[in-house]
Amino acid sequence: MNRAIHASLLFFLAFVMSVGGAFGQKVNYSEISKPFKNDPVFKTQKGAVKPGILQMPFITWAADGVTIHANGGERPNAGSKLGRAAGAPVKLERVDEFDKQLKAYVSGDSPFLRGTIGMINLAAEGLTAISPDLAPIVFMQLSWSTGADGFVAKGVNKLSDLKGKTIVVQRTGPHMDLVNVLLQDAGLTLADVTVKYVADITENPDNPVPGINDPAGAFRSDSTVDGAAAIYPDILTLTAGGTVGTGAEDSVKGAKPILTTRTASRVIADVYAVRSDWFAANPDRVKSIAKTLLEEQKFFRGHLDNVAKKKSADQAKLREFKQLSRPLAGIFLFDEAAVEDFVMWLGLDSELALFSGNEEFFGNDKSPVGFAAANKRIQSYYVAGGLISSQTLPAAAKFKWFESEAVPVPAAAVKPVFSSAQAVRAAAESSSAGELFSYTFGFPASMADLAWRDYPDVFTTIHEKVTRYGGAVVQLRGHADNMFHNFVRMKRSRGATTDERKVGGAFKKFPLPQVEEVANAANKLSYSRAFAVKRAYAQYLREHHGLSAQEMDLSRFDVKGMGVSDPKHSNPSSPQQRTENMRGELIIIGVESEIPLDFGMEDLR
């Protein structure tokens, strides 16, 4: 589950891979038990949690550096912040293999699981089947992935092009849920693709099994593979630096980045879970652990905010941050000199959840990407794909995470991503922009008084997509009925300049408008309809979600009137077909190179 990112070490790693190469090596595909509860890992003998030193897993992920800092390192330290919170010395152990974590969890070596919300959902059925004591309780969100993970493919432009393709993903890893989300939003199921699994998330020299065990290596070596879920450095290598792979220097010919979690920024949620029996016996200790880690996140967030001030940053504080990050760079990037890379990973490619994020994730049942919604979505998809036999929802600890539980913290104002309508349109039409998927909905006959309450399902779906793809441009397209345009074009092609219409029982002649006039009118009408949807969405956020204007960012919306340029039916022959032409579309457009970053490498030097 190693998701190390952003190193300027990337070119060194690429060199090592090209020298050591995967040419001619066998790809070791892994099977995944269906349902997963039949996996041999669930045959592990159940044991009580061992007393004394508390074993706590971490994974190769920047946010876990905060956990290590709170413990004063990986070794047991009763006097550390984390040790005091846990009421016992805590030994932090890197366990990137989820199966290994599950064995320790079941046997009682550790009461904790460290994974993503998708991974916890995958294991919940098997753990609960052993004993209700093992049912996982998710008690903390650490972070969101906001650039570290993604998907790469050849022969794919939109996500719907994945139908019939073969893709490779790490078995039981964080990318399984990313693949599920991409398929769902493309209107596909697991049955529409062939999924192959490998043991590692990236090349792992410590894997004792010779051959290729990672998605990038499989994509490179197996010509039947069309795409892979991978970490960002691997995506860059596979696509010749984020463009299109040529087949040289470990790239795959024709491969290009489809998206990363910079676009799909609310998909991969990293969490901690605890055994039900241990939580029942130690609720205050679990809450104290979570609170201490979130307080440590607040400390790190303060340092990241200082970096984001760029030239105005407090230089003494910047030096302090780099100094405390040195050992973390050594642990996660195997080089203490790679401090800037670690900070970029922590502050750009991931997003610390903080107290406010945990309150939102666990406490807001209306959130389309929160704990309740994520569990429901993941479980439904896993059941449909045969990965679980019945829905077994993980529970949440449901702590209150206001920093002062008696006084709610006022919501912070949201910083707009784009400065103007012109800027978001330029991003949507840039050469690097890519349409990922669309959602089509019908327009009512009159848009002047469009109210979201009349179309709650439409606006709930819009909100889900807008929130999940927090780094994308959201284009609202309006389409008009083309019947009158077709009629005028036909009449004009025959040389007509007038049209007869029945008025008051008698036919009268009227001047026939120019085709361009009809097209322009349709463009204006369709734009006004699309804009009415944006206006109604803002109303939905205010009234259904209780957001103020300062808490909304509508700058990512690009409103576009398509007029009659893209009809669903070019020659509508029924009222139903005319209605289907008069539609709205929500288009999610990836524009990763156009999204401004909070800071860059130059701000750390």
Locations of the language-model features?
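Periplasmic peptidoglycan-binding/anchoring modules of Gram-negative envelope and division proteins
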Residues: 443-505, 534-542, 586, 594, ...
